[in-house]
Amino acid sequence: MPNNESTQTTVDEILNVDEDNDEDESNIFEKPWLLEIDNVPDANRIVGRDDHITFLAKNLRKMRTNSVPDNVLEWGETGTGKTLVARHVCERLEAATEGTDSPIVTAYINPDPISTYTSTFRKIAEQVNAKAENPLEVPYQGLSAEHYRDQKLWPVVQREFSGGLVVIIDEIDKHGEVNEVLYTLSRTQSKDDVDFPVITIGISNDIEFKGEIESRVQSTLQPEHRTFTPYEEDQLIAILENRRDAFYDGVLDDEVIPTTAELAAEEHGDARRAVRLFRNAGEIADEEGDDIVTAEHVHEADELVEVELFMEMVKGTPLSGKLLLFALTRLDRNNPEKEWFRTSEIHEVYQTVARDVKVEPKGYNRALELLNKHVTTGVLESKKKEGGDQGKFRSYSLQGDVESTRTGLINSTPELQTLMGW
């Protein structure tokens, strides 16, 4: 039987911080916040995106001159600077108009597969009120989307941010009701009778999602499309050099930045991955008590990053969706010669996994729907086979490494931890 008192003592020792003990201070990181994924750096740390920054700044400046800015849709693979550019320019816009007669407010929404039309407007209202001097209370539930807008959002913008509202919606392809959201935002001035501009910046990693935006939305939104290309290896090096001061002087081996950039460049020039690798390598060195961060630490970090990225991709996924992915990893492990598995095969193993963790399995059609959502988010690939003796059927394949996917699922899903050895 485990000794709970001993376990509690160990936890307390880990959590305790002795301000007079130098051992509690990192010998590696001086400014760790520079490596946080959500950190929006100063302009002099941003690399290779001057044209996009200039375009967006000039476009949004129209809000200050009674002109009508364009709505914007940004396209490009993960880690190409889309979110960074949008958030950087919007932060500067808020700062530039603060204290003027027409301040402008911005909201940033990062949806997941379970985001709804109503929850999106609640989140926008929450963020706007959080920045207001005299905020309104925004209840978490119980109101319609129209009520959130008409009673909790537009009155506050009108009263305190008469220059207008800019809404950034990240990863629009993950939002199940994004067409309705974009349509409503694009018709705000005509339909909701407000006299301030409401501008939308939509961001997507999936260029093919353009075809999923309904024609009525395209017609009212009339967006300016901006395409972000992957970073080159030398640009990734510059991005990391601009964050070198996150570390103490002298702790980075000369090979760390080139190795990190090279690994990130292999993954379509992903700056987000590069910064995460950079940070994780430092954390590994710190945890191991090393005084120098080396290329070996970077390679160790590379394995961990795969798991972290996967956990981000499935964040917000319902339990059944995760169990289906776990079933697919089990099929992959047991059939190393196969890459593609039919829906019926996955569903059969999924039913076993669900019962193993004491969850009632979903039916075939719901499983198919969940698998297709994973295709939308890039976790899975799918293909359809028609004709032949077996008729029509759909097959699925994991996009990422099987073991990283499996580890990420176990780490993010308590119900699966009992199956760790399976």
UniProtKB/Swiss-Prot annotation:
Function of the protein: Involved in regulation of DNA replication.
Name a biological process GO annotation.
DNA replication
Q: Which one of the record's GO molecular function terms can you name?
A: ATP hydrolysis activity
**Which controlled-vocabulary keywords does the entry list?**
ATP-binding, DNA replication, Nucleotide-binding, Plasmid
Q: Which gene encodes it?
A: cdc6m
Q: According to the entry, what is the taxonomic lineage of the organism?
A: Archaea, Methanobacteriati, Methanobacteriota, Stenosarchaea group, Halobacteria
Entry's HAMAP family? ORC1_type_DNA_replic_protein
Record's protein name: ORC1-type DNA replication protein 13
Q: List the disulfide bonds.
A: none
Pfam families (alphabetical): AAA_22 (PF13401), Cdc6_C (PF09079), Cdc6_lid (PF22703)
Task: Report residues binding ATP.
Answer: 80-84, 231, 243
| Protein's organism | Haloarcula marismortui (strain ATCC 43049 / DSM 3752 / JCM 8966 / VKM B-1809)
